[in-house]
């Protein structure tokens, strides 16, 4: 039996709440803190006590419950050093290349600026888990609020270097809309069309599309496929850089 358990649920409208629990120590981390009540309900349902919040970035829909949960549990909040002044209750700052321990599980910090200037993702290499928040979604990526397309492409390239069997938990349930857009960019991709049909069925039943895997995203997510000749030809960008192709795809999604 694996030492780590995860509990996945919705917060607010479409934010994912994720609890990461170590059976041996009893430690429990919330990946971001979008909303207090759903997190408390999940903790009560599982019989867990919250010990950590791992904050990925400063947006309000990811830090809204930091202060109230810290007051209730006396927990430790870890977050990106480049956004520390914007993260309520932060205790420990981390940056790219840092490694820290969560209940005996190594956690690597990957800085992924683009959505925000200091956004980080948390990678647990031994457990094959990535918490990508608003950098990488199933069939999508985050909007560029504080970064350029070049910066975001570099961030996504960092994530693409992870093993294909890495399970990815992302910040929002946007997958159905992402699938509708992805088909317009990559219409001949049979793996994408098959996946889109599965997503339609999953969402019609009220199911969640998280987690995904890095291998699946590399095969079907147009934002990771800027180097694909078919996509480049469809966009008329055969000689453009990968970053420029990515920028065009991001622009089209913004206007979709």
Curated annotation (Swiss-Prot):
Binding site for Zn(2+) 1: 57, 59, 115, 134
One Gene Ontology term from the biological process aspect of the record: methylglyoxal catabolic process to D-lactate via S-lactoyl-glutathione
Keyword Transferase: no
Known pathway: Secondary metabolite metabolism; methylglyoxal degradation; (R)-lactate from methylglyoxal: step 2/2
Record note on cofactor: Binds 2 Zn(2+) ions per subunit.
Keywords carried by this UniProt record: Hydrolase, Metal-binding, Zinc
Any GO MF annotation of the entry: hydroxyacylglutathione hydrolase activity
EC number: 3.1.2.6
Cofactor(s) the protein needs: Zn(2+)
InterPro entries from the UniProt entry: Clx_II_MBL, Glyoxalase_II_hydrolase, HAGH_C, Hydroxyacylglutathione_Hdrlase, Metallo-B-lactamas, RibonucZ/Hydroxyglut_hydro
Reaction(s) this enzyme catalyzes, per UniProt: an S-(2-hydroxyacyl)glutathione + H2O = a 2-hydroxy carboxylate + glutathione + H(+)
Function of the molecule: Thiolesterase that catalyzes the hydrolysis of S-D-lactoyl-glutathione to form glutathione and D-lactic acid.
Family membership noted in the UniProt record: Belongs to the metallo-beta-lactamase superfamily. Glyoxalase II family.
Subunit structure and binding partners: Monomer.
PANTHER family: HYDROXYACYLGLUTATHIONE HYDROLASE (PTHR43705), HYDROXYACYLGLUTATHIONE HYDROLASE GLOB (PTHR43705:SF1)
Record-given protein name: Hydroxyacylglutathione hydrolase
Biological source species: Rhizobium meliloti (strain 1021)
């Amino acid at each position: 039996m694996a030492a780590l358990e995860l509990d996945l649920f919705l917060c607010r409208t479409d934010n994912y709440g994720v609890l990461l629990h170590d059976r041996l120590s009893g430690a429990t981390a919330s990946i971001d803190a979008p909303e207090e009540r759903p997190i408390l309900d999940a903790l009560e349902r599982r019989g867990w006590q919250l010990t950590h919040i791992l904050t990925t970035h400063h947006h309000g829909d990811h830090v809204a419950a930091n202060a109230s949960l810290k007051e209730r549990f006396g927990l430790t909040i870890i977050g990106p050093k480049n956004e520390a002044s914007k993260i309520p209750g932060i205790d420990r700052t981390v940056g790219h290349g840092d490694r820290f321990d969560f209940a005996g599980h190594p956690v690597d910090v990957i800085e992924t600026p683009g959505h925000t200037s200091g956004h980080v993702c948390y990678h647990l290499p031994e457990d094959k888990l990535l918490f990508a928040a608003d950098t990488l979604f199933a069939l999508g990526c985050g909007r560029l609020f504080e970064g350029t397309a070049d910066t975001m492409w570099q961030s996504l390239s960092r994530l693409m270097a992870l093993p294909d069997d890495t399970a990815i938990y992302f910040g929002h349930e946007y997958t159905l809309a992402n699938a509708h857009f992805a088909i317009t960019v990559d219409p001949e991709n049979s793996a994408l069309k098959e996946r889109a049909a599965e997503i339609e069925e999953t969402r019609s039943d009220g199911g969640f599309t998280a987690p995904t895997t890095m291998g699946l995203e590399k095969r079907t997510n147009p934002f990771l496929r800027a180097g694909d000749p078919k996509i480049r030809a469809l966009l008329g960008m055969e000689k453009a850089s990968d970053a420029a192709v990515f920028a065009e795809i991001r622009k089209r999604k913004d206007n979709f």
